[in-house]
Regions:
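Carbohydrate-associated surface elements
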Residues: 168, 190
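Membrane-proximal helix-turn-helix segments that form the acceptor-binding/catalytic region
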Residues: 88, 107-118, 143-162
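Nucleotide-activated donor-binding/catalytic signature segment of Leloir-type glycosyltransferases, i.e.
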Residues: 248, 255-282
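Conserved donor-binding/catalytic core segment of Leloir-type glycosyltransferases
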Residues: 7, 205-232, 246, 385
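N-terminal subdomain of nucleotide-sugar transferases
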Residues: 1-45, 49-57, 404-408, 412-423
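A short, well-ordered alpha-helix in the C-terminal region of glycosyltransferases
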Residues: 353, 360-375, 384-387
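Nucleotide-sugar-dependent
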Residues: 223, 279-284, 293-313, 320-333
Length: 423
């Protein structure tokens, strides 16, 4: 029997660099689906087409990441143009019965619309709350913000099933989107413990200091890296010269952050690696004594789950972060939570406290690792991923061939008691 064919479209990152999308594609392939992924090209991922582990990956041309309203208009328009052309070609060449669109932005449903007329079903994989994301970047609720709200509503309107990364995003789908609870599934973005596991620390990575503070994520002000630099400066002003900060990752403001580091005279205390291979990333974080998440307190960060938190936990690292709803849900006792009001000083004091209490660092690290192993690892998300696809295939209805009752995905995963969302 032919495998059910699906197409996954992601606009903002290449695959397999986008870890969530790659884990989804791999898990679906391993469970009997014929998977094709369409994504942009990026540094290190310039090949237009390749087959990786049985998964066809197509990459379209992409403009440089935008940082203005006009820039976003050009970037998204360019992406939609190529996505539509590639999708038409993939449909004619390989075929697909379900399309999965990953945001941001909330625009992939536009690619799905003409194919829905052919009976194709659409799954919305909700990575980021776009209205909140826009406001966190620009602090405005003008015309562009209202367009984001409108596009989100349309995305929900034309989605047959929604996959949310956490309970807060599921609530958005139920309240702002008005979806049936049976059509919304929580698929958390936990680390894959088969590949993301601690390695022995390498003292050479501590830059000659006794203690290393680790960070991984996107290099942008929105991620709170400016706060982290102020934290490092505060620690330096306290007379500490025994602590080094290593920040891992690429992003639109990497050059600006390096310049800020230079301006604050922190070059001997802070370094930015840029984007590096996962093996090197894991070695640095495994060497770190404390890992940090300086995401700024705001509505976007409050309702979002950051994969870095669970990666730190998987590597048995104690964490310092601000007290945010989903961050606390993920880390629980594996983290200390800095006061939102006294951002820099309290964040710094939490780091210093952990530095001075190695037994507590070990206890918190063990607690975090155990929580990931028992609840948050990617393996616990696969069941809901499969349930979401089982649900959408029960809705699939091809006008020339009524397959709803015979599709293997529907019969093996389609019962409501097996496909119900979990929290």
């Amino acid at each position: 029997m032919a495998k059910p064919k699906i197409l996954i479209i992601v606009e903002n990152l290449p695959v397999p660099f986008d870890k969530r999308v790659w884990k989804e594609a791999s898990s679906l392939h391993q469970n009997g689906y014929d998977v094709t992924v369409l994504c942009p090209r990026g540094k290190g991922y310039e090949q237009g087409h390749e087959v990786i582990g049985g998964i066809h990956v197509y990459r379209h041309p992409m403009l440089k990441e935008a940082n203005s309203g006009f820039g976003y208009l050009c970037e998204y328009g360019w992406a939609l143009f190529w996505e539509f052309l590639y999708t038409c070609w993939i449909y004619l060449r390989r075929g697909f019965r379900v399309m999965q669109g990953c945001n941001p932005p909330d625009l992939v449903f536009l690619i799905a619309l003409p194919f829905k007329l052919l009976g194709i079903k659409y799954i919305f994989d909700h990575h980021d709350a776009s209205p909140e994301l826009y406001f966190s970047k620009f602090g405005k609720k003008g015309v562009v913000y209202k367009i984001q709200v409108w596009l989100e509503k349309l995305t929900y309107r034309f989605s047959d099933v929604v996959m949310s990364t956490n309970g807060s995003y599921r609530d958005l789908a139920l309240t702002r989107g008005g979806l049936d609870p049976e059509d919304v599934f929580i698929v958390r973005n936990g680390p894959d413990l088969r590949t993301f596991t601690p390695v022995p620390p390498n003292p050479a990575l501590k830059h000659g200091k006794p203690y290393l503070i680790g960070y991984v994520g996107t290099m942008s002000i929105q991620e709170g890296l400016d706060i982290l630099l102020d934290v490092a400066l505060h620690i330096k002003n306290l007379g500490r010269r025994d602590i080094h900060f290593t920040c891992i990752g690429g992003g639109p403001e990497l050059a600006r952050l390096r310049k800020m580091t230079q301006d604050k005279d922190l070059e001997e205390m802070v370094n930015f690696t840029g984007r590096i291979p996962d093996k090197q990333l894991v070695e640095i974080l495994s060497t770190a004594d404390v890992c940090v998440n300086p995401d700024k307190p705001c509505e976007m960060n409050d309702i979002s789950t950051m994969i870095k938190i669970m990666e730190y936990m998987a590597l048995e690292k104690p964490i310092v972060q601000f007290d945010l709803k989903e961050g606390r849900f993920s880390a629980q006792g594996a983290s200390l939570y800095a006061d939102r009001r006294s951002q820099v000083t309290d964040f710094a004091s939490k780091i210093l406290w952990l530095i001075e209490h190695p037994a507590e660092r070990k206890r918190m690290g063990n607690l975090g690792r155990r929580r990931v192993q028992e609840e948050l690892a990617w393996e616990y998300s696969v069941d809901n991923l499969l349930a979401a696809y089982a649900r959408v295939f029960t809705k699939w209805d091809w006008r020339s061939s009524r397959r709803r009752s015979t599709d293997p995905r529907a019969t093996s995963h389609g019962r409501l008691d097996e496909a119900r969302p979990s929290t």
